[in-house]
């Protein structure tokens, strides 16, 4: 259906079918990566579920969104340590993961899993972590703000201004501002603070949850919708 839509649109070009077949090969590799993670999580009783576009694709398209190149899943922050430990000991040798626990150069708090031989920037399963929220709305807003601030401070500390390709000038300016803001803060202290804050409110004891990263104020959902 997607291919037919493109063929009948003004976006169609001569090499589309050939390029899309190549693209589907990468989609299959990502889907296989998800299968590996699914087995690992089931065997180790780690709670996870599809999220965002990946969840939409599973429901609407009975698989991946036709033009989506990655898969997104969410895991409770309380299970992060166990999940990372499982990746270290149980992930097949032909796969690898990228996270702050595995690579000191990592600038974000999500985890990416990919087949070896592929850059996690381009082919991956994105693992986002979610945290419960305090019941008081004002406290919940403060909590989400602190998670966002810690995430951006950490990213700015690790940001490579010499070699990094930024998506926009706004992103670059944002990183400069947070680098200055975090001048007197140690990277390890930011990470330790984040780990304490992100696990403060277990989802099972909370009515709502948010993403435990820079998009914490974008995603705020009832806890009954997960796990």
Where are these regions (language model features)?
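A short, surface-exposed interaction/processing loop segment used at functional sites
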Residues: 150-156
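Active-site nucleotide-donor binding segment shared across nucleotidyl transfer reactions
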Residues: 38-71
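Non-catalytic N-terminal targeting/anchoring module and adjacent flexible stem/linker
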Residues: 1-4, 15
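Helix N-cap motif at beta-to-alpha junctions
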Residues: 77-80
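Conserved SAM-binding loop
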Residues: 82-85
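Conserved catalytic core of two-metal-ion nucleotidyltransferases
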Residues: 12, 18-42, 87-135, 140, ...
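Short, His- and charge-rich active-site/binding loops that engage polyanionic ligands
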Residues: 143-149
């Amino acid at each position: 259906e997607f291919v037919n839509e493109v063929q009948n649109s003004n976006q169609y070009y001569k090499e589309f079918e050939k390029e899309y077949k190549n693209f589907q090969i990468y989609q299959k590799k990502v889907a296989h990566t998800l299968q590996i993670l699914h087995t690992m999580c089931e065997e180790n009783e780690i709670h996870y579920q599809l999220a965002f576009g990946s969840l939409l694709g599973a429901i609407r398209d009975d698989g991946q969104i036709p033009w989506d190149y990655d898969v997104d899943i969410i895991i409770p922050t309380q299970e992060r340590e166990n999940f990372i430990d499982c990746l270290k000991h149980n992930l097949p040798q032909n796969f690898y993961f990228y996270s702050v626990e595995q690579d000191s150069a990592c600038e974000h708090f999500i985890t990416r899993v990919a087949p070896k031989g592929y850059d996690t920037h381009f082919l991956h399963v994105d693992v986002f972590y979610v945290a419960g929220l305090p019941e008081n709305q004002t406290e919940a807003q403060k909590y989400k703000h602190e998670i966002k601030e810690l995430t951006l401070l950490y990213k700015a500390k690790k940001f490579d201004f010499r070699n990094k390709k930024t998506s926009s000038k706004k992103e670059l300016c944002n990183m400069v501002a947070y680098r200055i803001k975090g001048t007197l803060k140690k990277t390890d202290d930011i990470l330790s603070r984040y780990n304490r804050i992100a696990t403060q409110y277990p989802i099972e004891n909370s009515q709502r949850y948010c993403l435990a990263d820079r998009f914490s104020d974008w995603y705020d959902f009832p806890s009954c919708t997960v796990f």
